[in-house]
Amino acid sequence: MGVDKIKSKILDDAKAEANKIISEAEAEKAKILEKAKEEAEKRKAEILKKGEKEAEMTKSRIISEAKLEAKKKLLEAKEEIIEMAINKLKEELVKLPEQPEYKDKLIKLIKDGAISLGGGELIVRLNKRDMELIDDSTLWNLEKEVENATKKVTVLKKGEPVDIAGGCIIETADGLKSLDNSLEAIFNRNLNVIRARITEKLF
């Protein structure tokens, strides 16, 4: 199953769960409002002697507070759904390196990172699995592409393995600059966009 299909399935599952949670929240909202109305009527009867105007004001205040509470519960339910969808996407992110197209994506991440750092002598840090996936000949070919883009002689060397789900971390040889193109970092950099798209899709 491709990444897009996986994401679509996750969002569809999350939407079904969203409908369930929102239905429960709506039912809770109705109960809160009904109880508030009953309480308001009761309180109204008790203070009628103080004047109808004061009674109506008290009733309105109680109902208003109940509506705010119900709205809060709905917002909490939506946030729970969004977090659930994000967590599922994170789980699928860990599985991305198992996809056949992953090597090409990894090569592009290395290339983009090297170009962003301006070429030169760079250290490519990968996890243990990807250290085997990216051989020296792949890095040699990338050196030429980076040189063409940056107009600077480029040398790419693999550094010590790093604990990431996938992707790469590129560092200058002097250690002064680095670019984190790990899958986790890319996900976090795009988290606001991801949240917005999930919200649009579900609600």
Curated annotation (Swiss-Prot):
Keywords: ATP synthesis, Cell membrane, Hydrogen ion transport, Ion transport, Membrane, Transport
Name of the protein this chain belongs to: A-type ATP synthase subunit E
Chief place of localization: membrane
GO cellular-component term (any): plasma membrane
Topology in the lipid bilayer: Peripheral membrane protein
Coiled coil: none
Domain of life of the native organism: Archaea
Compartment(s) where it occurs, according to its Swiss-Prot or TrEMBL record: Cell membrane
Family from the record: Belongs to the V-ATPase E subunit family.
